[in-house]
Amino acid sequence: MEIAATELVLKNASVAANYASQARQLDPSNGYAAIMLAQAYAEGATACEGFDRQTVYWLAYDILASARSLFENGSPEQQQIDQTMSMFRRSFPSNDELFFRGLTTAGAAYDVKCGWITGRTTVKMVE
């Protein structure tokens, strides 16, 4: 995890994501690895533009949502996750954008493709 954190500070988001993903695979209960992976995705999203960039935040949001349950209720980690999830929600595509792309069903499967960031998530409507 220290290597992932260092790589993230050095703006090597893809390398950080790789290490965080490996740590998460070795220990799925490691909430810190999930947080680091979500942060790396958010940092890496800057390499893309427009809609592709925005959908990365769906994926990062999902990762944080799964990490949230790994921490004690009301813990500082949960509070930080909640703040970050709120920030990510503000970066989601607008409902108008989703409509124009034919993505009108919240919860429908969606494959994110933004440079080195790929993954399956679901369409999330802005509340």
Regions found by a protein language model. Name each.
Residues A5-K11, A38, E43-D52, S86, ...:
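Short coil/turn linking the two alpha-helices of tandem helical-hairpin repeats
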Residues A17, S21-Q25, D52-R90:
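TPR/TPR-like (Sel1-like) alpha-helical repeat modules
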Residues M1-E2, Y32-M36, Q80-Q83:
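Alpha-solenoid helical repeat scaffolds
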Residues R90-E127:
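N-terminal alpha-helical interaction modules that lie
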Residues G31-Y32, S75:
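Helix-start (N-cap) detector for alpha-helical repeat units in TPR-like alpha-solenoids
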Residues M1-S29:
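Alpha-helical adaptor scaffolds
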